[in-house]
Amino acid sequence: MLEPITSEHIVSENNSLTTQSVNAEQPAVAKINLLDLNRQQLREFFAKMGEKPFRADQVMKWMYHYCCDDFEQMTDINKVLRNKLQSVAEIRAPEVAEEQRSADGTIKWAIKVGDQQVETVYIPDGDRATLCVSSQVGCALECKFCSTAQQGFNRNLRVSEIIGQVWRAAKIIGALKVTGERPITNVVMMGMGEPLLNLNNVVPAMEIMLDDFGFGLSKRRVTLSTSGVVPALDKLGDMIDVALAISLHAPNDKIRDDIVPINRKYNIETFLAAVRRYLAKSNANQGRVTVEYVMLDHINDSTDDAHQLAEVLKDTPCKINLIPWNPFPGAPYGRSSNSRVDRFSKVLMEYGFTTIVRKTRGDDIDAACGQLAGEVIDRTKRTLKKKMAGEPISVRAV
């Protein structure tokens, strides 16, 4: 059964994004992590210290353009303020627990978040460098083809743990002001977790990605992927404008109810209506959404499925990414053959859809789509139920 979506998963009506105190008078043992603050919050923090707003901009440039986490190195800030910052604040990104490098250049990092881990994937491709970022430890949505979903939901990541993945990757690859080149050109919120179930932290993190004093990415180069949390998608459109990708994976409700269980709450028609509402507000998407469709052998990959998919998407401007399924231990599916993928793709193109078969990257290090699992201390009710029922538990360490 799909775990209920609670207030722990999603922003409430009365909860603002500025949920963390920015009181600079805290004792040293409770230093505020500046990676938790977007630019507006950082300016409020400096105002409480009696400083001008431009000080926030200066510090932010050091943090994100230089990947600097040492106030003493911020040479255009006076010594008195640097000392004050040392006493009340810190710049602390999550650390790398383990690094794996693929033969194709993909890098997967296991990132320490408290006593647990999430995974972040760096995918270089010519002049593009895409970072796949996690938003939660585990996931509540139980998509059957996804390794992360087998863990269940553990907790939401903080802003500093989300933007910290980008910061840490940029630090490793080489900061903009150090190398003269952007270490990361694109960010996709397609790692572990459902981003729309962590809006309070995902949105401020994306604001930092877009901010000129942050990572300065174009809104067309920051992509949020969702499986269809409709109320949160409607909220997203009022909060920020970024590129949208949807994890559809089925041509009809019967199949999607089984493999993407949130469909039982928000069916395809309801989901696509919300997508069109978002597109109507968005400039980042240039009028169309990216549809993600994982190819599962003899589950959703027939030519009849392709015709149904074309029909269901006829009123939703989109491009379609067909994703070869990437196996993980204990999974009940097989990968569609190349011939079935090719036939499926040709049907969609005959209907006029831009259709791309995604190139699998990093599968030799379990960094491909659907393979991210991380190493977690699993406290979920789902795992407890499995233990009590004597069922096998599939949580793969990195």
UniProtKB/Swiss-Prot annotation:
Active site: 119 (proton acceptor), 369 (s-methylcysteine intermediate)
Signal peptide (UniProt feature, chain positions): none
CDD domains named among the record's database cross-references: Radical_SAM
GO molecular function: 4 iron, 4 sulfur cluster binding; metal ion binding; rRNA (adenine(2503)-C2-)-methyltransferase activity; rRNA binding; tRNA (adenine(37)-C2)-methyltransferase activity; tRNA binding
KW Manganese (keyword) present: no
Cofactor note: Binds 1 [4Fe-4S] cluster. The cluster is coordinated with 3 cysteines and an exchangeable S-adenosyl-L-methionine.
The EC number(s) this enzyme carries: 2.1.1.192
Enzyme class, spelled out: transferase
Reactions this protein catalyses: adenosine(2503) in 23S rRNA + 2 reduced [2Fe-2S]-[ferredoxin] + 2 S-adenosyl-L-methionine = 2-methyladenosine(2503) in 23S rRNA + 5'-deoxyadenosine + L-methionine + 2 oxidized [2Fe-2S]-[ferredoxin] + S-adenosyl-L-homocysteine; adenosine(37) in tRNA + 2 reduced [2Fe-2S]-[ferredoxin] + 2 S-adenosyl-L-methionine = 2-methyladenosine(37) in tRNA + 5'-deoxyadenosine + L-methionine + 2 oxidized [2Fe-2S]-[ferredoxin] + S-adenosyl-L-homocysteine
The entry's keywords: 4Fe-4S, Cytoplasm, Disulfide bond, Iron, Iron-sulfur, Metal-binding, Methyltransferase, rRNA processing, S-adenosyl-L-methionine, Transferase, tRNA processing
Subcellular location: Cytoplasm
Similarity comment: family membership: Belongs to the radical SAM superfamily. RlmN family.
Protein task: Specifically methylates position 2 of adenine 2503 in 23S rRNA and position 2 of adenine 37 in tRNAs. m2A2503 modification seems to play a crucial role in the proofreading step occurring at the peptidyl transferase center and thus would serve to optimize ribosomal fidelity.
NCBIfam families associated with the record: PRK11194.1, rRNA_mod_RlmN
Other facts: Reaction proceeds by a ping-pong mechanism involving intermediate methylation of a conserved cysteine residue.
Name the UniProt record assigns to this protein: Dual-specificity RNA methyltransferase RlmN
Species for this entry: Serratia proteamaculans (strain 568)
Taxonomic lineage of the native organism: Bacteria, Pseudomonadati, Pseudomonadota, Gammaproteobacteria, Enterobacterales
